């Protein structure tokens, strides 16, 4: 059973992560396409995922949510860290490959950005996408983010240095 609804859109629901979601999260994060898209190089095992879950539920400076389509978990989205004093946070997200290109990421980001601005009263949401991830860059631009800069060869993924493109959206 998925966790309680946090934010609901037409096609996705953002829910609290529950312990029963850990197996999905662990399997998804070990998918090479997902891992690459978020800059990971080492797959998580179930114990590492459980540790992540424990940190998430005890951390007041982040919001980490399960993205579901109907009742099916399809990804994760979060705001981290939430800096209330500066009014800024960063959004991070991933969706399992079989749901790419369906608009679920767009709707999930729109929901969480609205939450950041309207409920948390933040001034700015930032995001990053790697140079090879054109789809993520297009998604961010589609929902209104502006590219603010590029850190060249900032991260080492799968044997190659990759650029990191930084985006921002101001309320």
Feature map (PLM): residue ranges:
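Acyl-donor (CoA/ACP) binding surface of acyl/acetyltransferases
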Residues: 1-13, 17-29, 68-171
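Short, hydrophobic secondary-structure boundary micro-motifs
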Residues: 36-38, 64-67, 164
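Conserved GNAT-fold acetyl-CoA-binding loop/helix
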Residues: 33-54
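A short helix-loop-beta-strand connector motif used in the catalytic cores of GNAT acetyltransferases and
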Residues: 53-66, 75
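Proline-rich low-complexity regions
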Residues: 2-5, 43, 61
